[in-house]
């Protein structure tokens, strides 16, 4: 790393990281109470915050995940409703800028920044984990960019999941040197303990009406434009022979609905493509992933991918573009990377997967995921909460 990179804290598998005991997260020597923190927003479909909060509690932090907040004053309202905790740990901020109502207004952004100022004036520490550089559908919206710049400058600590993310954040938003010094790189934990990652693969295929023979390529998750599912169908169809009984399984809810209609039109011409265009209940997610031999995530744009870590946690190798944090953080012996700027590269990656020992890659994927324990990550996060 360059000398101006600022502090970088790592909590990576195989590296020793100090893990404080139950009282280590308390506020100073002999403190009467532990640090209290809220993590928001929390969504039912994403266990990231719940897993982190559970690990933080083991470190002595009183951590609560927040899934509801007052519309008019989300940050201040959530902080007050949870007893004015010491730390407000933000993740995605779209819902605090107007959410589904469209792009944020100047008033939304100013109010968001004012709430950050108010929280800090009341003694709260602001922590931000950067999952995306900007909203997936935000484009080059200058007002959303202003909100991110405000958060970067106000935050007491900024957590990123790879060094490339740190570099990209600096390139995009040009933060002050002081803000750069508050950026820290921590690992992204796995989902091994959250799901039935050892679900029987043969039974999973039977439940989905898939033959036990042949390679099953799968995409799993919400189907949005930036995820490139249309390009995946085109690459699969153009790839020709991917082995006897090869199938492409697409599972997830299209957003917006027109994407689903486009996929149905394409799939109608290729009987090897199986569509399940609906939201996958959490209890069925493991079955879908275990039915696959390899999970394909053809993002057009991405920083970090919980979906990739989810697949690897289920012992399934991934096919992904060499974008964002993926080349730096995913295991090279359990992932097949391709050049997103080469229009033929995805089809080539599918052929490479078809010829690979996917079972061996899957075993390596699971071993890697087993090493991504939330404990060391929570220990470092608690340290940032304390401001050590």
Residue ranges of model-derived segments:
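Donor nucleotide-sugar binding/catalytic pocket of nucleotide-sugar-dependent glycosyltransferases
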Residues: 153-196
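Conserved donor-binding/catalytic core segment of Leloir-type glycosyltransferases
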Residues: 211-227, 233-236, 249
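Conserved acidic donor-binding segment of nucleotide-sugar-dependent glycosyltransferases
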Residues: 332-344, 350-357
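Glycosyltransferase donor-sugar binding loop
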Residues: 191, 247-261, 278
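Nucleotide-activated donor-binding/catalytic signature segment of Leloir-type glycosyltransferases, i.e.
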Residues: 260-286
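Acidic anion/phosphate-binding donor-loop and adjacent secondary structure
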Residues: 139, 170, 187-207, 375, ...
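A charged, aromatic-enriched C-terminal amphipathic alpha-helix characteristic of glycosyltransferases
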Residues: 359-385
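Short hydrophobic beta-strand element within catalytic cores of glycosyltransferases
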Residues: 294-297, 317-321, 327
